Amino acid sequence: MSAKDFLVELGTEELPPKALNSLGEAFLSGIEKGLKAAGLSYAAARFYAAPRRLAVLVEQLAVQQPDRTVNLDGPPLQAAFDASGNPTQAALGFAKKCGVDLQQIDKSGPKLRFSQTIAGQPAAGLLPGIVEASLNELPIPKRMRWAARREEFVRPTQWLVMLFGDDVVECEILAQKAGRESRGHRFHNPDNVRISSPAAYLEDLRGAHVLADFAERRELIAKRVAELAAEQQGSAIVPPSLLDEVTALVEWPVPLVCSFEERFLEVPQEALITTMQDNQKYFCLLDANGKLLPRFITVANVESKAPENIVSGNEKVVRPRLTDAEFFFKQDKKQPLESFNERLRNVVFQAQLGTVFEKAQRVSGLAAYIAERIGGNAQNASRAGILSKCDLATEMVGEFPEMQGIAGYYYATHGGEAEDVALALNEQYMPRGAGAELPSTLTGAAVAVADKLDTLVGIFGIGMLPTGSKDPYALRRAALGVLRILIEKQLDLDLVAAVNAAVEQYGDKVKAAGLAEQVLDFVFDRLRARYEDEGVDVAVYQSVRALKPSSPLDFDQRVQAVQAFRQLPEAEALAAANKRVSNILAKSEDEVPPNVDASLLVEAAEKALGSAVANAESEVAPLAAARDYRAALARLAALREPVDTFFADVMVNVDDAAVRANRYALLAKLRGSFLGVADISLLG
């Protein structure tokens, strides 16, 4: 079957830059979905997206649907004809439904059947509907109307190109009649651009100063920005989201180096970077030591004969923003950081839980408690907690919310606070996302954990639990943050005690009954998802969770040990044996003695197991106490042979009550040895 290339380009006013790439991907996905549903084969398809256009190119698209055969089954033969062989109403009705005479119906099978070959339709007639359906399904939160039209789209449409091979596909979509005339660059080539063929689309537009390929523009910008940064003896900060947004803002990217006065470098560089990236879409430059250079790169959408004018224009635009940051920084430094705490008495943390000032007091107390238990400095942790929210009341954070914590660090340093106290003011918000940086200091870790536990306890304490996708207080992220800090920083904290301490601090603001257990279950349940992401079987998690370790670090060490144990050849048999032992003990009506009476061990197999368990117990106990769980389970793996022999040769539930109880005691000792690490009966 013959095939042709197909191109559709919808021209619009400037599309939302943050959504441009996703709109292009969705446009392509919708068209591919429509082509597959129509049975139209093709070799490849790709999308193109620029500020004023969305396009899809389909290579080697079939010019027509394949013919298809439709089989319709009717009533069974015995219901289709009476005893005399005359057609019944059922047979006549089926023939009428098929639109044919009964003579054309197949009667060779158990049922009447009508087969019909339907000729495939030309692709050109199907393409407008496929394109329109894809456009209607684009993920656009709010569509708009324009002029006096009833059509709706994310932005007013301006033109429509639709070519199948060399021919225009005649149609009208979103108030635009299809043709082959596109538009060039708004300034360099404002006239119409004739698209000679789908395959020539990119080159035809390139000649009109438009790079329609999003990926090509993105790569060009990234490469040129890196080159310009190197020329300035620096490196550029290129967040992927910023690169995507800048790519979506320009059709003909021309990166240019600009500068600002060095005096602004006295302002925290994070504030300067924030305003230049977020407000101006500039790429900032760092020196070899990670310090901000007084230069930045802007990406113009025009190849100017006088680029210095564009440079000076951007320098003029950025100066007031940097001046504002400088002013806020100087104003805030005029008073001690702690003095900002008074303003927080009037800032509500949560209506039922009090003010941010009160939260800082709680964080201070809990941070000191935690620091004492993880080997930190309780006094510094308490001080950091008191100062932890002060910067929220500063001018700097009021203007640049992203500076919370960072501003606190700079103001604390300026005020002569201890280095770990200053760092903790920023580290309290760590980790800021999945896989993000963790606190570098014990003081920072203590404050970060305290802040998150305080939020968890408070919000749970007033019954505002996260539901489904709704988690307004980011409690899931807080729980994962606590776990990451304690596990990855190897901090051994009794979380049960810490949560209870947090509950006590709230007093009557929360419903304390059962609150600690609820919070702890929520936190430890987050570990399940963490381990699943790491490829750890849920049974491994459950085997440790059954013991309810109170320290996340201890929990993780047990999980890693069980994960290693599962790889041993003895693991499966011992897991099954432990499950059998668990069931036997659960069904026992006798009281299980605490110790094994060697004189009641009768059979050779139970004597061997008794000796093996006793020896293992003496070796495993110190290993478990030292939390060398991997070695403990490896030692217990040696019990497989005597355990297998015991169950093969010994009947547990004998008539002699004393012997039976003693065998229960032996099995309880066996199970207890494993329970020092995990309940491996759950691994089966």
From Swiss-Prot:
| Class in the EC hierarchy, top level | ligase
Q: What is its EC number?
A: 6.1.1.14
Could you confirm whether the keyword ATP-binding appears in this record? Answer: yes
Q: Which domain of life is it from?
A: Bacteria
Q: Which Pfam families match?
A: DALR_1 (PF05746), tRNA_synt_2f (PF02092)
Molecular function GO labels: arginine-tRNA ligase activity; ATP binding; glycine-tRNA ligase activity
* A biological-process GO annotation: glycyl-tRNA aminoacylation
Any one GO CC term of this protein is: cytosol
Major subcellular location class? cytoplasm
Which reaction(s) are listed as its catalytic activity?
Answer: tRNA(Gly) + glycine + ATP = glycyl-tRNA(Gly) + AMP + diphosphate
What UniProt keywords are attached to this protein's entry?
Aminoacyl-tRNA synthetase, ATP-binding, Cytoplasm, Ligase, Nucleotide-binding, Protein biosynthesis
Q: Where in the cell is it found?
A: Cytoplasm
Xref: PROSITE patterns:
AA_TRNA_LIGASE_II_GLYAB (PS50861)
What binding partners and quaternary form does the record give? Tetramer of two alpha and two beta subunits.
Looking up NCBIfam families in the UniProt record yields: glyS
Q: Which protein family is it in?
A: Belongs to the class-II aminoacyl-tRNA synthetase family.
**Annotated protein name in UniProt:** Glycine--tRNA ligase beta subunit
